[in-house]
Amino acid sequence: MPEKNTQRIIGIDPGYAITGYGIIDKCGNKFSVVDYGVIETKPKTDFPVRLLAINEKIKFLLDQFKPDYMSIEELFMGKNHTTVIGTAQARGAVLVEAARAGIEVFEFTPGQVKLAITGYGVAEKKQVQLMTKSILGLKEIPKPDDAADALALAICLANTGVNFAGKAVSGYQYGRYGYSRRNEFG
């Protein structure tokens, strides 16, 4: 169980084939890795079954590790609309469980994550991975890339999105810090 002033954050890099997750604790200026990995779904499996697998694994992770906050990559439109739609549905499978668990969710663009991790909003993926490794005191860059991205998302929120009173940081949040969505259902 984390210390009293520790924030536990789960970062999610959503995808319908591979969803990365990374769970960290932040106490003061110190970070520790709790767990990280990926949720993989089988390509030939019916799509609703793939979404259910993502949903069930997220539920398991939230129940087991009890994070205070979730940081998830904001959806952006690329050239492949089929991939965007699938990723959006995978995000939905994740967000439903966050809402069910009462976890506050913060969304960040890739540029916001890069800025928070490296200080440079258009950093290369390798730079972000090296800084993630350094910040978390790991011996190796986390693998696979989806897990490394999820850890970077968690660090981004820990460094920019929430103060120790557990409140969203005030001020201009969307442009630099992401934003939170509060559970409107109770």
Describe the function of each predicted region.
Residues 1-186:
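Phosphate- and other anionic-substrate recognition elements at nucleic-acid/protein interfaces
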